[in-house]
């Protein structure tokens, strides 16, 4: 008798995705982040659901409702901190997942890569809207500054901003619609993640060597289910440590002050995971130029398959490209640091230099290094 998991219409899909899936035998721990991102999404949807049961999306009561969750709801403080820090863990996993894709040449799977970029944008939009909901000072001013960037779009900009706000400033209408979108977007993310997996399973996973692995594949279960569970346990340990020992480490103290449209905080800045893009935005004195640089700083990922000029897929055997890659990582960390600093003397120049280096590495240095390595192969 054939096993039910191979015949049942629903179980068959699960079987082909997580049990009998042929997987390259040499994929390293860098391939754990896909499952960890799924884990993060489940945590965020569940904690968000319980928070939404007690939250009110009204400018008068939003801040108080979050306080009420933390003080009066059973384990409300835990749910709130899981949700807030869950977003940070989500982005850590996202950045590592994208970095892995860049290092090992996974972007040559066009469809999977492009769906991944759409996923990244969707998660960023979700996180931004979620940051507005507690209606603290940084929530309000962050929403005002970031939505205002759309006014840089010629001709329709101002109308577009007022349309998004639902009025002439960030107010009740804005908060209500942001709550509605913040609630629905994670489910769209989940649907997109399934499409992402669908395209991935059409080609099979990449592996560290970047070579075709048809001749050396093992079933996903038990080998990689165990590996993913270990990854989830390590993730859980780090996550619980963060929540229980330093829950406010990655947050902004200004957000513990209720939103006040009459009082602007001295340094308006987004959450830490947007700081690199914020630094690129600020490094250009022109408003429209800054907005374009901000969007292109992430949209540039689309160009990686086109800019891949190397004869080898992975960077595993390309020491020069490895060097350039790690300089890019250091540059992104520099941009993150600059994004959190005030707009004054040394930081402005450092930010501008780091922004130039970021685009130069991706558009010029990496492709040139690839061509040089191709020459060295013949030498």
From Swiss-Prot:
It comes from the Eukaryota. SUPFAM superfamilies: a domain/subunit of cytochrome bc1 complex (Ubiquinol-cytochrome c reductase), Transmembrane di-heme cytochromes. Keywords: Electron transport, Heme, Iron, Membrane, Metal-binding, Mitochondrion, Mitochondrion inner membrane, Respiratory chain, Transmembrane, Transmembrane helix, Transport, Ubiquinone. It is found in: Mitochondrion inner membrane. InterPro entries: Cyt_b/b6_C (IPR005798), Cyt_b/b6_C_sf (IPR036150), Cyt_b/b6_N (IPR005797), Cytb/b6-like_sf (IPR027387), Cytochrome_b (IPR030689), Cytochrome_b_C_euk/bac (IPR048260), Cytochrome_b_N_euk/bac (IPR048259), Di-haem_cyt_TM (IPR016174). GO terms for cellular component: mitochondrial inner membrane; respiratory chain complex III. It is a multi-pass membrane protein. Binds 2 heme b groups non-covalently. A ubiquinone binds at residue 201. This is Cytochrome b. It comes from Belomys pearsonii. The lineage of its organism: Eukaryota, Metazoa, Chordata, Craniata, Vertebrata. The gene is MT-CYB.
């Amino acid at each position: 008798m054939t096993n039910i998991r191979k015949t049942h219409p629903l179980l068959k899909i699960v079987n082909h995705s997580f049990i009998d899936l042929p997987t390259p035998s040499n994929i390293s721990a860098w391939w754990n982040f896909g499952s960890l991102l799924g884990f993060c999404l489940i945590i965020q949807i569940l904690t968000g659901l319980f928070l939404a049961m007690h939250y009110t999306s009204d400018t008068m009561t939003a801040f108080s409702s979050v306080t009420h969750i933390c003080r009066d709801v059973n384990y409300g403080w835990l749910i709130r901190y899981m949700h807030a820090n869950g977003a940070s863990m989500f982005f850590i996993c996202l950045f590592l997942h994208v970095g892995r894709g860049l290092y090992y040449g996974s972007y040559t799977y066009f469809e999977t890569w492009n769906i991944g970029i759409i996923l990244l944008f969707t998660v960023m939009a979700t996180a931004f809207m979620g940051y507005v909901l507690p209606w603290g000072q940084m929530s309000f001013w962050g929403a005002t500054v970031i939505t205002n960037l759309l006014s840089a779009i010629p001709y329709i900009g101002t109308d577009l901003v007022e349309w998004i706000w639902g009025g002439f400033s960030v107010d009740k209408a804005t908060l209500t619609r942001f709550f509605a979108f913040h609630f629905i977007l994670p489910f769209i993310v989940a649907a997109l993640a399934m499409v992402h997996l669908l395209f991935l399973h059409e080609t099979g996973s990449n592996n560290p060597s970047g070579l075709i692995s048809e001749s050396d594949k093992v079933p996903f279960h038990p080998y990689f289910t165990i590996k993913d569970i270990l990854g989830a346990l390590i993730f859980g340990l780090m996550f619980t440590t963060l929540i229980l020992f330093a829950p406010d480490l990655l947050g902004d103290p200004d957000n513990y002050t209720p939103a006040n449209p009459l009082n602007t905080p001295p340094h308006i800045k987004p959450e830490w995971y947007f700081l690199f893009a914020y630094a690129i935005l600020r490094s250009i004195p022109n408003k429209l130029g800054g907005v374009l640089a901000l969007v292109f700083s992430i949209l540039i990922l689309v160009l990686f398959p086109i800019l891949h000029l190397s004869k080898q897929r992975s960077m595993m055997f390309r020491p020069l490209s490895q060097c350039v890659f790690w300089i890019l990582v250091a540059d992104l960390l520099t941009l993150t640091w600059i994004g959190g600093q005030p707009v004054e003397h040394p930081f402005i120049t450092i930010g501008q230099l780091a922004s130039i280096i970021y685009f130069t590495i991706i558009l010029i240095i990496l492709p040139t290094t690839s061509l040089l390595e191709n020459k060295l192969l013949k030498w």
